[in-house]
Amino acid sequence: FETQLELRQQDKLDEKVFAETRLRRGVYGQRYDNGQRHDGVAVRAIEFPSSSLTKGPDTAWDAPGMQRIKIPFGGVTPEQLEVLADLAEEYSDGILHVTTRQDFQLHFIHIEDTPDLMRRLGAVGITSREACGNTVRNITACPIAGVCRDETFDVTPYSLAMADFLLGHPDAQDFGRKFKVAFSGCAGKACALVNMHDLGFIAR
C-alpha cells in the first residue's frame, strides 16, 4: 500500500488503479456538497453537532478522507480502544464513529497519514484490510453474544474464525460489492439481522 501511495504521489500510478488498492485497505475519499470543501479548498470550518470541535483553521484541506477499521463481531480490547482513541485525536477530529457493521471509522484523515495509522493499528492486532471494496465486509454477530441469557452458544469464536479465514483469501477478492456475513447465537431468532445478509448463520 505504501509503495503504491508513493507512486501515486509521484504521478506514476493512475488514480483509478490506486483507488482499488486504497479501498481494499479501508481508505475512502470524502466529498462535501454543502460548501464545506470544493476542489481541496476550505470555504468554512466544519462544525460538529453539540461540540466545539473542528479540524481547526490551520488544516491543509487536501481532500481529507475516511479510514474504516475492521473489528470482527465488534470485539475490541481496552488496549485497542486506547490506540483507537489516540488515533482519533491525532489524525482525525477526535471522534471515533461506530458503524452498523460493528466497525470503527475515522473521518477527515489525510491519505499521507494512512500508512502510519495502519502500522499502529497492526501493532495491537487490528486491520483495515478489506474493510471496503469488492470483498467480504466485516463479519458481524449479536451485539451481546457471549453474555446473552437466551443464546444457544457464544458465536463470537465462529465469527472470528470466519473473518480470519476470509481475510486475504484469493477466492474472496472479487465478490460482489458489500458481501456481508452475520452470526446469531439464539436459536430461531434473527439476531444481528442475519436474515438480511448474504450469509446468515443461526446457532441451533
List PLM regions with ranges.
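Charge-rich, low-complexity segments
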Residues: F1-S52, C191-V194
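Small-residue-enriched alpha-helical segments and adjacent helix-cap loops
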Residues: E6, Q30-R31, R37-V43, P64-R204
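N-terminal glycine-rich anion-binding loops that anchor highly charged ligand groups
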Residues: F48-P64
